[in-house]
């Protein structure tokens, strides 16, 4: 009959527990730390990755997005930074919510392409090269190069007679 309480092997004689390959990939992947740091903190992303300081109301806006609030209204005048804050949020979401499909629209085509989407493109150019190089910027779409169908920002207009239907 076997001993129910066998003497354990000395530590030097015990077999090491094999590591999974995925453990090594995670341990050696700086993007894992990047996600931990910025996934729930768009304000820190804007400050450290985009190297700019948002206004207090933009901080509140970004924090509402991070909290998962789906309906956010910003009442303000012209030129105060609504498109800028929206661009920051889209870029943050693109990098930290993979896979993600961000579809953006505006009341008119000129507002969409000349203001909002132009602002997104402007901030993509500000990204550090290690991030900017991961993106392909097109006229109406910004894609993650290696996942162009899984992660993108797309500008879409709608018809005046049916504004709820994006084209």
Whereabouts are the PLM-identified features?
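Phosphate/NTP-binding elements of NTP-utilizing enzymes
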Residues: 2-167
């Amino acid at each position: 009959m076997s001993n129910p309480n066998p003497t354990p092997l000395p530590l030097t004689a015990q077999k090491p527990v094999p590591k999974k390959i995925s453990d090594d990939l995670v341990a050696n992947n700086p993007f894992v730390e990047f996600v931990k740091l910025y996934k729930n903190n768009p304000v820190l992303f804007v400050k450290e990755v985009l190297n700019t300081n948002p206004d207090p109301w933009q901080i509140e806006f970004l924090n509402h997005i991070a909290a998962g609030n789906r309906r956010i209204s910003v009442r303000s005048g012209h030129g105060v930074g609504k498109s800028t804050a929206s661009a920051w949020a889209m870029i943050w979401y693109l990098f930290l919510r993979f896979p993600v499909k961000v579809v953006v629209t505006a009341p008119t085509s000129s507002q969409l392409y000349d203001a909002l989407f132009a602002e997104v493109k402007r901030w993509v150019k500000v990204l550090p090269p290690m991030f900017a190089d991961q993106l392909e910027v097109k006229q109406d779409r910004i894609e993650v190069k290696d996942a162009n169908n899984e992660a993108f920002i797309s500008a879409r207009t709608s018809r005046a007679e049916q504004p709820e239907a994006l084209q």
